[in-house]
Structures are given as structure tokens and as C-alpha cells.
């Protein structure tokens, strides 16, 4: 009798254990199903003129915004890019997969080449916006524009929107990367906020020189990284305000930030050398105190606003703070 009772007890233990395992498995299955249910099948983006409903997990993407391209790469989906303007890529994007096909230039898309790729999604840019109607006939077309008056909030929002195309894991990674970038931004900003140095940003272009203000294409420097602008009134236009050597000397900035557009689009750097050796230029506090930052021109002029490009931009300007 005792043996029978012992056997019954043992069987009961096995049954309970089996039930427990089933419950755990069921629970895991339920969690997996719930996670899958949370994944969106569509997201709503914009092309600057209208909202665009886009299916998530696009397999074939054509990208004209290089900052978005580097965000896609950082999130782990570079193989989903099938076409880009490959002629004038900045150096940091030269190692993209060879499978990516050329789709025209950064300002003039090759419509036939794009159509032949049969993309699920086209990510246009401000430079290609005039081709929007032609592009959206091929595939849903969106633009991730940047608000220069609210630069970092605009960029981080775009990064999150790009991540939303690829699901929860991508969104989680994007949040981690944004948090890391914000920590790096704060380190630079803290140094600049304690400084009294005034900064002038200049662009060199085919022998000419233009100055840019705090709400220009260089807003990241002033709004986010907290470089202090000079007291000079500079028009915040897309191409900047024409500036002479006499004007630079009169402003006498403590820091000068230089971008060579000629170099960015494939020219040489001789203009920068000429300017740096100019007698009036040498009389500024910036040159006297070795506080001239020569930006990585192709990075700042052709790209920006992406996860990787933002990291590199921060590294570019940290040099003068060390």
C-alpha cells in the first residue's frame, strides 16, 4: 500500500512539473505574440507637402539624404539600401556595400535608374525636392527635413522616425544612440557655456568667403554645442553673408570655424591655406590663439543630421576645446 501511495505521489509531482512547464511556455508564447502585435505595419511620415503612409520594414530603399543613410547603417539596415547618389559621397560613407546602385547626383536624381530598382521607399532631400512628383510616382517618397531654429530636437525626432520604419529593436537602439549623443553634446556645451570666447563661422567657396549666423545651416554649433556667436549682425541666409578680410578683422572673433565648400565638392584646399596666411586674418584673436577649426568639409556640407555624422561633427569641434 505504501508503495502504491509513493508511486501516486511521484506521478503527481511529474504532472505538476509538466503543468508548470506548460504555463511557462504558454507565458513566453503570449509575450512573443504580444510583442509581435506591438510592431506597427505602417507609419505616417511626410514629404514636406503631405502626409505619407509607409509600410514598415522596407526591403528596398533609395536614399538621397546622406544623414538618413548613415542612420540606417548605424541601426543595422544598410543592406536595405539599394540606391544612392554615389558620385560625391563624403569620406565616412565611402565604405558602403558595393551592391548599392547609383541613382544620379545629390541634386538631380536619375529617374529611370530609380524606377528600375523598384524601391519600396524613396527618401528624398531638400536638394531633390523639385523632383518630388516624379519620385512619388515610383514609390512612397518622404523627406526628413531639419528645422535650423530647433536643430537637435528636429534631428533627434528624425532619427526616431527613421527607426520607426524598422521596428522595436531599431527604436530601442536609436534611443540608446540619442542618449549617448546627448551626453557628448552636453560635455561640449558645458565647456562653451563657461567660456567667453565669441565664434565666427565662415564658408569658403571658389575664392569667396561667407559668414553664417546662429540660426543658419550651422545652428548645431550655436544652439546645441553652445558656441557663442559674435556681436556682428549676420544674415541667416542659406548661402551666408559675403565677408571680406577687413570684415573678419573688424569682428575679431576669438574662435573661427571654417568650412571649405570647394573641397567638399571635390576641389582643392588651396583657398583655405591662402586665407589662413592672409595678414588681416592673422591679426584676429582666433588665429593668434590657435583657435581656428577647419571642419571636415564633405561631412558638414554634404551630410549631417544622422547618427554617425553627428558623432563625427562633435569630434570635429572638440579639437579646439582640448
Feature locations, PLM:
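Structured C-terminal subdomain patch of bacterial secreted/periplasmic proteins
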Residues: 60, 154, 254-322
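Extracytoplasmic substrate-binding proteins
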Residues: 140-205, 291, 300-322
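Proline-aspartate-enriched helix->loop->beta-strand connector
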Residues: 118-124, 140, 248, 252-256
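Bacterial Sec-exported substrate-binding components of ABC uptake systems
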Residues: 4-6, 19-67, 170-200, 263-268, ...
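A short, structured surface patch at a secondary-structure boundary
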Residues: 60, 65-113
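Extracytoplasmic ligand-binding site segments that recognize negatively charged/polar headgroups
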Residues: 90, 130, 144-161, 197-220, ...
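Alpha-helical, coiled-coil/dimerization segments enriched in small aliphatic residues
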Residues: 87-91, 211-241
Amino acid at each position: 500500500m505504501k508503495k502504491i501511495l509513493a508511486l501516486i505521489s511521484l506521478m503527481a509531482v511529474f504532472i505538476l512539473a509538466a503543468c508548470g512547464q506548460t504555463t511557462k511556455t504558454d507565458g513566453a508564447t503570449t509575450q512573443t505574440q504580444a510583442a509581435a502585435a506591438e510592431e506597427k505595419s505602417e507609419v505616417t511620415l511626410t514629404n514636406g507637402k503631405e502626409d505619407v503612409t509607409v509600410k514598415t520594414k522596407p526591403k528596398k530603399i533609395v536614399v538621397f539624404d546622406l544623414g538618413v543613410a548613415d542612420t540606417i547603417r548605424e541601426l543595422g539596415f544598410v543592406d536595405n539600401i539599394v540606391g544612392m547618389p554615389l558620385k560625391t559621397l563624403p569620406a565616412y560613407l565611402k565604405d558602403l556595400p558595393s551592391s548599392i546602385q547609383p541613382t544620379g547626383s545629390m541634386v538631380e536624381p536619375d529617374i529611370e535608374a530609380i524606377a528600375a530598382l523598384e524601391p519600396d521607399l524613396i527618401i528624398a532631400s531638400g536638394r531633390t525636392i523639385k523632383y518630388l512628383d516624379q519620385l512619388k510616382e515610383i514609390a512612397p517618397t518622404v523627406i526628413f527635413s531639419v528645422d535650423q531654429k530647433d536643430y537637435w530636437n528636429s534631428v533627434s525626432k528624425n532619427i526616431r522616425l527613421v527607426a520607426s520604419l524598422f521596428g522595436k529593436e531599431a527604436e530601442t537602439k536609436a534611443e540608446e544612440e540619442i542618449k549617448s549623443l546627448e551626453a557628448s553634446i552636453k560635455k561640449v556645451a558645458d565647456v562653451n557655456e563657461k567660456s567667453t570666447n565669441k565664434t565666427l563661422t565662415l564658408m569658403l567657396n571658389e575664392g569667396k568667403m561667407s559668414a553664417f549666423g546662429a540660426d543658419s545651416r550651422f545652428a548645431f554649433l550655436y544652439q546645441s554645442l553652445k558656441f557663442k556667436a559674435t556681436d556682428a549682425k549676420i544674415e541667416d541666409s542659406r548661402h551666408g553673408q559675403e565677408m571680406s578680410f577687413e570684415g573678419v578683422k573688424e569682428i575679431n572673433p576669438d574662435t573661427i570655424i571654417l568650412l571649405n565648400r570647394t573641397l567638399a565638392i571635390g576641389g582643392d584646399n588651396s583657398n583655405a591655406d591662402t586665407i589662413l596666411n592672409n595678414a588681416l586674418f592673422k591679426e584676429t584673436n582666433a588665429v593668434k590663439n590657435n583657435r581656428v577649426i577647419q571642419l571636415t568639409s564633405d561631412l558638414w556640407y554634404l551630410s549631417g543630421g544622422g547618427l554617425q555624422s553627428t558623432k563625427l561633427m562633435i569630434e570635429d569641434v572638440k579639437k579646439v576645446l582640448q
